[in-house]
């Protein structure tokens, strides 16, 4: 049992209040596992472009834009119905903001939140996404019925439960999910052939294929989609689409001299002891995090 004071302390310690806090967390993660890419998930909202620019400068490797339509059965109903904006709006704003600030080549853009078809993937690519996340629909393909009791251990179809009698009800097969994604890929291939494009790479961030439908409906007559299809600003330089396969580096850090020390390496491989005195300055960040990562591996 935790007291209210203890709960508040834990909440404060685990929260991110600024880009600086996030940058420090990303730095910590890169220290612990230098080869691992760090992904930051942002909910689609007005002003997300400015936030994404800060996240990119904070050395994130991937920025994930999540739309309002997403949410698995474990998500609160209020989050599924009332949180965030469509991923299309957030993705378009982030892509443009990163291009305007010469940051687009530093991060991969990923989007999710209600993606269901190959058409959704193509639209996401045209708006700037390079990776695409499927959650709920992939779970449904293997048998999920969205009962929204994942956290109660009472899943009626045995997807999210540890109870043996319920797990016996699970009829899903890996092939079901594989077939779903095969048809997604086939739909994408058909769309590419229709518009005369050979590869997905040609689509990414290329708005010349986007236009609005000339359909007049009362509920959409006041919606302005100019920001999504406006191609007046031409970004002819597409060098940003080539990303490094390696995670961002923190550069030379204090622990590097220790990690290359022969005595340390011997102690690490033989589970022996190692002792060394070093001077730590206030500019040294995440001290010993890299060593902890090496020990964990």
Pin down the residues of each PLM region:
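Short secondary-structure junctions and interdomain/linker hinges
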Residues: 20, 29, 36-37, 187-198, ...
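Single conserved hydrophobic/aromatic residue that forms the stacking wall/gate
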Residues: 1-8, 12
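Short acidic (Asp/Glu) and glycine-rich catalytic loops that position anionic groups and cofactors
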Residues: 7, 31-32, 70-74, 104, ...
């Amino acid at each position: 049992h935790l007291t209210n004071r203890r709960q508040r302390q834990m909440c404060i310690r685990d929260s991110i209040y600024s880009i600086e806090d996030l940058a420090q967390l990303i730095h910590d993660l890169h220290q612990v596992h230098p080869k691992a890419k760090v992904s930051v998930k942002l909910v689609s909202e007005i002003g997300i472009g400015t936030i994404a620019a800060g996240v990119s400068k904070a050395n994130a490797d991937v920025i994930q834009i999540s739309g309002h339509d997403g949410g698995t059965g474990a998500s609160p109903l209020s989050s599924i119905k009332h949180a965030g904006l469509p991923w299309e709006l957030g993705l378009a704003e982030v892509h443009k903001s990163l291009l305007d600030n010469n940051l687009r080549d530093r991060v991969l853009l990923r989007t999710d939140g209600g993606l269901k078809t190959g058409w959704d993937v193509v639209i996401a690519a045209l708006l700037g996404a390079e990776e695409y996340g499927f959650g709920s629909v992939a779970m449904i393909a293997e048998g999920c019925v969205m009962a929204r009791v994942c956290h109660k251990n009472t899943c009626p179809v045995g997807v999210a439960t540890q109870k043996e009698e319920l797990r016996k009800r699970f009829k899903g097969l890996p092939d079901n999910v594989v077939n779903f994604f095969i048809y997604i890929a086939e739909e994408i291939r058909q769309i590419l052939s229709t518009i005369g494009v050979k590869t997905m790479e040609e689509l990414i961030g290329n708005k010349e294929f986007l236009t609005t439908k000339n359909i007049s409906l009362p509920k959409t007559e006041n919606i302005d989609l100019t920001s999504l299809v406006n191609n007046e600003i031409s970004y002819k330089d597409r060098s940003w689409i080539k990303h490094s396969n390696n995670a961002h580096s923190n550069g030379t850090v204090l622990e590097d001299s220790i990690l290359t020390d022969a005595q340390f390496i011997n102690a690490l491989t033989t589970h022996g002891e190692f002792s060394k005195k070093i001077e730590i300055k206030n500019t040294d960040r995440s001290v010993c995090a890299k060593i902890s990562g090496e020990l964990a591996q």
